[in-house]
Amino acid sequence: MSQNGAPGMQEESLQGSWVELHFSNNGNGGSVPASVSIYNGDMEKILLDAQHESGRSSSKSSHCDSPPRSQTPQDTNRASETDTHSIGEKNSSQSEEDDIERRKEVESILKKNSDWIWDWSSRPENIPPKEFLFKHPKRTATLSMRNTSVMKKGGIFSAEFLKVFLPSLLLSHLLAIGLGIYIGRRLTTSTSTF
């Protein structure tokens, strides 16, 4: 809550999270907020209470479907220290019911977190079905002159290679020349008839 120039006057309602500070002259020429002093321990209590109230209201109004953040042992130690610290500094307006309710909330959050972590860690892995596993086909022996016994023995200029290669070369050339002559005659006769 904000305080006006007089320390005893307090505003009853805060608009959002804004706090209005009024400055007073302390005699040294500098201005210091009236609500801030070294001996003012009430401010710390007010801030702690506001933090606890805001935590409770935000956790109740949250409708998010995602699981809450998992707490580490350090977080649980901090939560228990905060609870014991806040018990010692309770105002008369807070009752034992609020304290019990807060402890139940913390325990339920811890239980939910551990259940969620256990469910997540024990789920089956996403392995595709066996029919979708792609396998490379086995490589068949390619037809190549390099892998023949003729090439392994003597190379290109061996007698065995030349006996096979030269007749096939001559035959393919004769076929190509014959096909070329045939197509050429067909084209010349078709153009002369028009």
Swiss-Prot record:
<feature type="modified residue" description="Phosphoserine">
    <location>
        <position position="54"/>
    </location>
</feature>
<dbReference type="GO" id="GO:0000423">
    <property type="term" value="P:mitophagy"/>
</dbReference>
<dbReference type="GO" id="GO:0010637">
    <property type="term" value="P:negative regulation of mitochondrial fusion"/>
</dbReference>
<keyword id="KW-1000">Mitochondrion outer membrane</keyword>
<dbReference type="GO" id="GO:0043068">
    <property type="term" value="P:positive regulation of programmed cell death"/>
</dbReference>
<dbReference type="GO" id="GO:0140507">
    <property type="term" value="P:granzyme-mediated programmed cell death signaling pathway"/>
</dbReference>
<dbReference type="GO" id="GO:0050873">
    <property type="term" value="P:brown fat cell differentiation"/>
</dbReference>
<comment type="function">
    <text>Apoptosis-inducing protein that can overcome BCL2 suppression. May play a role in repartitioning calcium between the two major intracellular calcium stores in association with BCL2. Involved in mitochondrial quality control via its interaction with SPATA18/MIEAP: in response to mitochondrial damage, participates in mitochondrial protein catabolic process (also named MALM) leading to the degradation of damaged proteins inside mitochondria.</text>
</comment>
<dbReference type="GO" id="GO:0009617">
    <property type="term" value="P:response to bacterium"/>
</dbReference>
<feature type="modified residue" description="Phosphoserine">
    <location>
        <position position="95"/>
    </location>
</feature>
<feature type="modified residue" description="Phosphoserine">
    <location>
        <position position="92"/>
    </location>
</feature>
<feature type="modified residue" description="Phosphoserine">
    <location>
        <position position="66"/>
    </location>
</feature>
<dbReference type="GO" id="GO:0140506">
    <property type="term" value="F:endoplasmic reticulum-autophagosome adaptor activity"/>
</dbReference>
<dbReference type="GO" id="GO:0031966">
    <property type="term" value="C:mitochondrial membrane"/>
</dbReference>
<dbReference type="GO" id="GO:0071260">
    <property type="term" value="P:cellular response to mechanical stimulus"/>
</dbReference>
<dbReference type="GO" id="GO:0014069">
    <property type="term" value="C:postsynaptic density"/>
</dbReference>
<dbReference type="GO" id="GO:0097345">
    <property type="term" value="P:mitochondrial outer membrane permeabilization"/>
</dbReference>
<dbReference type="GO" id="GO:0043653">
    <property type="term" value="P:mitochondrial fragmentation involved in apoptotic process"/>
</dbReference>
<feature type="compositionally biased region" description="Basic and acidic residues">
    <location>
        <begin position="42"/>
        <end position="55"/>
    </location>
</feature>
<keyword id="KW-0053">Apoptosis</keyword>
<dbReference type="GO" id="GO:0042803">
    <property type="term" value="F:protein homodimerization activity"/>
</dbReference>
<dbReference type="GO" id="GO:0005634">
    <property type="term" value="C:nucleus"/>
</dbReference>
<dbReference type="GO" id="GO:0046902">
    <property type="term" value="P:regulation of mitochondrial membrane permeability"/>
</dbReference>
<feature type="compositionally biased region" description="Low complexity">
    <location>
        <begin position="56"/>
        <end position="69"/>
    </location>
</feature>
<protein>
    <recommendedName>
        <fullName>BCL2/adenovirus E1B 19 kDa protein-interacting protein 3</fullName>
    </recommendedName>
</protein>
<dbReference type="GO" id="GO:0000422">
    <property type="term" value="P:autophagy of mitochondrion"/>
</dbReference>
<dbReference type="GO" id="GO:0010666">
    <property type="term" value="P:positive regulation of cardiac muscle cell apoptotic process"/>
</dbReference>
<comment type="similarity">
    <text>Belongs to the NIP3 family.</text>
</comment>
<keyword id="KW-0597">Phosphoprotein</keyword>
<dbReference type="GO" id="GO:0045837">
    <property type="term" value="P:negative regulation of membrane potential"/>
</dbReference>
<dbReference type="GO" id="GO:0051561">
    <property type="term" value="P:positive regulation of mitochondrial calcium ion concentration"/>
</dbReference>
<dbReference type="GO" id="GO:0051607">
    <property type="term" value="P:defense response to virus"/>
</dbReference>
<dbReference type="InterPro" id="IPR010548">
    <property type="entry name" value="BNIP3"/>
</dbReference>
<dbReference type="GO" id="GO:0021987">
    <property type="term" value="P:cerebral cortex development"/>
</dbReference>
<dbReference type="GO" id="GO:0010508">
    <property type="term" value="P:positive regulation of autophagy"/>
</dbReference>
<dbReference type="GO" id="GO:0071279">
    <property type="term" value="P:cellular response to cobalt ion"/>
</dbReference>
<dbReference type="GO" id="GO:0061709">
    <property type="term" value="P:reticulophagy"/>
</dbReference>
<feature type="region of interest" description="Disordered">
    <location>
        <begin position="1"/>
        <end position="102"/>
    </location>
</feature>
<dbReference type="GO" id="GO:0005789">
    <property type="term" value="C:endoplasmic reticulum membrane"/>
</dbReference>
<dbReference type="GO" id="GO:0140580">
    <property type="term" value="F:mitochondrion autophagosome adaptor activity"/>
</dbReference>
<dbReference type="GO" id="GO:0051402">
    <property type="term" value="P:neuron apoptotic process"/>
</dbReference>
<comment type="subunit">
    <text>(Microbial infection) Interacts with adenovirus E1B 19 kDa protein.</text>
</comment>
